[in-house]
Amino acid sequence: MLLELDEPLLQRIYQLEPDPRPEALFADTELGTHVEQGPWLIQLTPDSPLLSAYRQAPEQWPGVLLSSGRPVDELLAHLRAMLVVQFEGERKGILRYYDPQVASYLFAATEAVITWLGPIEQLFWHGPTWADRSENISHWRSLRSESTNHGAPPKGRLILDRMQIAALEQQQLEAFAYERWQEHSHAEFNQILGYMQQGIASGFDDEKSLGAYLEARLTYPQHLSHPQIASGQVQFRLQQLQSWLEATPAPSESQG
């Protein structure tokens, strides 16, 4: 099991698993100075009470479950190689694939399963997407490797492809939409997500301006869309939008 730990959770682990042999994933990596902020690999036996506890209440265990017949050192080497990935040329970033929420987006968009799983035979997790969470939907997910030849860990960084990048960007967008949806209980999650997509398409692509755009749209929900906004400074463009929303009758009124 690979999960993020705090002191109470670590105590529970030792109560359920006498010899979990925790291994810090960030150790011996370029993230080594942040070991305590990273996840830990916990070794389980098939009849482990911890495994049973995870299956019964997965939301209490923030991580993913791995099945592998390979040595622990080999598994750790691969998991560590997945921590920092490359994308869009020379850009790189930390990949929190061990977060069930992130896993639900990333691995659903992963085609090169053998490359990403390496010595992992099967990956399990229980985590909704943000859209699922807005509807109180959650279920088990899994990813299985069809290969028995796992080979050595990747020599260079793993590279995110376009589908994976798009999935992770969608995860970030939906996370922001979910946060705003919790603040606006009168609105539907998909309504807020749709507004945000329109806002980004209109050039409001940073958190502050997108938040202001969203507030304006939620104030006038009768408008499903708006005309193209003239170019200029962000505040000027927001004022243009606000003026149009205030002055334009609702569609039903204009047709009456």
Describe the role of every protein-language-model region.
Residues I42-L50, Y54-G69:
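Signature for HUH/AEP ssDNA processing cores
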Residues M1-P8, G63, L214:
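Short, hydrophobic/proline-enriched secondary-structure or compact coil segments at domain edges
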Residues R12-D28, E36-I42, P46-P49, V72-D73, ...:
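A contiguous, surface-oriented mixed alpha/beta subdomain in the mid-to-C-terminal portion of proteins
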